[in-house]
Amino acid sequence: MPVGRGKMNVLDIAIILVYFAGMILLGLYASRKQTGVDDYYVGGRSMGSLKIGTLWMAGWIGGSSVIGTSSNGYSLGITGAWYVTAIAVGCIVFAFVMAEPIKRISGVLNNITFPELIRHRYDVKNSVTASITTILAMVGYTAAQFVAGASILNVLTGWSLGVCYVLAAVVIVFYVSTGGLLAVTYTDIIQMILLVLGVVVFAVPLCTNYLANAGVSLTADLPQSYFDFGAWGWPTIIALCASTILSFFTSMDSFTRCIAAKDARTAKVGTIYAAISVLVIAGASTYLGMAGKLILPNLDSANNVVAALVVEIFPHGLKGLVLIGVLSAIMSTADISVLTGSASLTKDIYQQFINPGA
């Protein structure tokens, strides 16, 4: 079954446009609080644990988490939660192993980027390698988030894919470039509130109510395999968890969050907070996918399950709210990728080799 396009009314579209305008205004507000490079790239190194936790949650709960997990829930069942569960485990491991040392070392060296740490510990050659891989990874990851956001807008509004892509990209690049990490933090707080409201507070109860009215339930009407945690295949699950957890130790945004904390304990506690929050989103996204299998069993693509549920069963007004909840997950991942990629390009390439006096 194809997903209906353009089924949103004026109210839904207005909610989306107000959301985009709000992100731009937050970027402008944050730009007025900039006093130097530290403020721009690492928020003045003074953020509390809740802000750090929000940055972690926002950065890791992106399009691949919400859309991918719900898609796996639709196709495979509860085993689809493994990817986001691995993110939560990664947060815990990183919190106890790396968060405090990174904050302490960055305070001594006064560094801003991950490659700067590499340069101080090893040499310039290794730092350049770290910079190039960081920039390439962030470009690819950011582009993927832009595409995910554009695809959702395209499905639900009927706007052309090109227009949706440009809109998502322009809004994100604008508020990041004007406000830096403070803008990312302010917008991420709003975006995570919207994500929880859209996916957990609104979408889950609406789907539950729809199933109850239809006289069906997950446990009675889904195949038994949908409740097998190993249905994805244990080799795949182990490989996925290992690669996800290890990626925390090589991703520059992990270091940025720790450097931005006001002290070492805050860096650790904030990361633990994120792990708890991530598990809530993992459960909600998997549930939406499994509920979608009963509500809309013949979708052409499991990747469209959240968009399809919004289009087909949600009332107008809530369509827009749930959509911006999902968009928030995508945009909050893209913004930190834009910031950290630009930080590495500026600090580790431009200032190091092209214009050292900048």
Regions found by a protein language model. Give the residues of each.
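Membrane-interface "cap" regions at the ends of multi-pass membrane proteins
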Residues: G4-I67, V176-G179, M192, G198, ...
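Helix-loop-helix module between adjacent transmembrane segments
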Residues: W82-V176, S243-S247, S328-D335
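Membrane-interface helix-loop-helix modules in multi-pass membrane proteins
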Residues: V42-N110, T236-S247, S254-N298, L309-A329
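Hydrophobic alpha-helical segments and their helix-loop junctions in multi-pass secondary transporters
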Residues: L26, A30-K33, F96-A99, T142-F146, ...
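Membrane-water interface regions at transmembrane-helix termini and the short interhelical loops
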Residues: N72-L76, K103-R104, A148-L156, V170-Q191, ...
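Small-residue-rich segments of transmembrane alpha-helices in multi-pass membrane proteins
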Residues: M47-W56, R119-V124, V128, Q191-P205, ...
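Hydrophobic, small-residue-rich membrane helices and short re-entrant helix-turn-helix hairpins
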Residues: N110-R119, G180-I189, T250-V280, A302-V305, ...
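Membrane-interfacial loop-to-helix junctions in multi-pass transporters
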Residues: V10, M47-L50, R121-T129, T157-V166, ...
